[in-house]
């Protein structure tokens, strides 16, 4: 099978936006105009082609990035729809990693919104070229030039209009093309009836002004064009287009276009812009990777001739075919039924079938080529971020880094049948989503699930119910406390039962003292002269270890303690391992009154990124959560606050931050160390755990 579309004619793009800017509707329209859908599904009726998980249709938000392929004017356009909600930023990062370009969708009434800032930052990190589509031009309060202004003010983006709208709100009925120097008028609501006309007289002055600004902005980035511009020479449409393309693909310039996806206006022109200005796989730098054994850096170019290499960027469980692994091919070709090496895990994998996905239908293909995005069936060990490559030419492509989960809750199956299914379901979900973890708590036996935020876990529990038919009760979020000693003491433990027949006898003297942080429990045997026989020493150590696991104050494990066995006595007949084990645990109980035990809590290193105007509120909020601010810095037009905050005070923080900053703040946190809990809180924890 030969390649259907050349690399030059391939585009891998993402559509990124704030919630409700109209991203899914825009994708829908693209699929409609490129002939992939026959009827258009509206998001607010819950029938959109891209939103194919049930919860997405109910909530009207996009959670999973579905990969779709479409065709436009002899080009293949692979589209990845990305979610716009803070809890799903990992989905966005994961898709940006494998894209060559993106369309940022703005709401014409609001311009750049909070999540736009987050996603824009992520796209800048990955060096993704972007064009901006100002959507909802038919909405009340729509203002194209205001929206362009927010790109400059909030993102410091070098963004300039390539189009101007004719009218706005109900009157929005056409678009002026500044590059082609013409206008398009829409006669009906399906947007299929388009008339190309000269720029209407009343708009000519404004169009000339903005065309001048556009040429000036592009000329600043292109020396040849600059010379022509300064000498007053005419710049042709072809030269202007080529210069815009060059500046856009090098991420120095962001073209802005407009329309209303809902009213089907401007979508075809947006597709034209994707083809004209966003890069093909040949226009982006070759991907770098390392050879597993030698750590030597190598490059893989977008070419069918190079050895096969691909990155798995998404795992999904499909009700019909099982596990689907979405991957982007960076170099070489792959045939279905062949073997590849998962170089990240060092495992050999067989690619069963290869599917080209269209939101929720699929087409089976026999070969994928460099630059393609497809889904494989049959990969067993591959997870998100893994590299797949040719068995003879191993390479590990730069993988994705995912943040640690920040919130955890206990989850209990409602029945025995649910319990059996829950383990499998949680394993599948954590395979799909690297920021979701599930484990069994050794201390309580409960199943704990952890994720990126409250909405994230809500949706996981929801998916358990719908997709895996598991009913479960969810507990309140929990903190893993610990205990330790602050003082040293020598204590005695004596266990004696000697009332006729064989008795029990064990007797020890143990010195306890605090150990260095992070060193855990250390045991030392200082017995001289055999006052405690050698065979009983391991029993003393085991007795202490068991007792320490169950805590001395509130039932949490005791950490960072040294214990030395210094003295004791035994009985020839009555002593046993069991007796010494019990004597050791009695010594630990005796230590409680002398060793000043305290409760420790996990401290989180928190980083909050916010617009400057919320600085005061956020600092106050951090302090009220027993946090210590450790530093501040400016990052672009945002402020970064770094602080150390107890985990127990961070529950509900994502929601609080969202309301304190109108959704414009983001935060991340990682575990840093354990620290002593203030006495008043320690007393509350002890009371709660003793059930008082």
From Swiss-Prot:
Q: Which SUPFAM superfamilies match?
A: EF-G C-terminal domain-like (SSF54980), P-loop containing nucleoside triphosphate hydrolases (SSF52540), Ribosomal protein S5 domain 2-like (SSF54211), Translation proteins (SSF50447)
UniProt keyword list: Cytoplasm, Elongation factor, GTP-binding, Nucleotide-binding, Protein biosynthesis
Which domain of life does the protein's organism represent?
Answer: Bacteria
Q: Which family does it belong to?
A: Belongs to the TRAFAC class translation factor GTPase superfamily. Classic translation factor GTPase family. EF-G/EF-2 subfamily.
Where is this chain primarily localised? cytoplasm
Question: tr-type G domain: which residues?
Answer: 8-282
One GO biological process this protein is involved in is: ribosome disassembly
Q: The organism's lineage?
A: Bacteria, Bacillati, Bacillota, Bacilli, Bacillales
UniProt GO molecular function: GTP binding; GTPase activity; translation elongation factor activity
Q: What does this protein do?
A: Catalyzes the GTP-dependent ribosomal translocation step during translation elongation. During this step, the ribosome changes from the pre-translocational (PRE) to the post-translocational (POST) state as the newly formed A-site-bound peptidyl-tRNA and P-site-bound deacylated tRNA move to the P and E sites, respectively. Catalyzes the coordinated movement of the two tRNA molecules, the mRNA and conformational changes in the ribosome.
Cellular localisation: Cytoplasm
**Positions of GTP binding:** 17-24, 81-85, 135-138
Q: What is this protein called?
A: Elongation factor G
Cellular component terms (Gene Ontology): cytoplasm
Mention any Pfam family matching this sequence: GTP_EFTU_D2
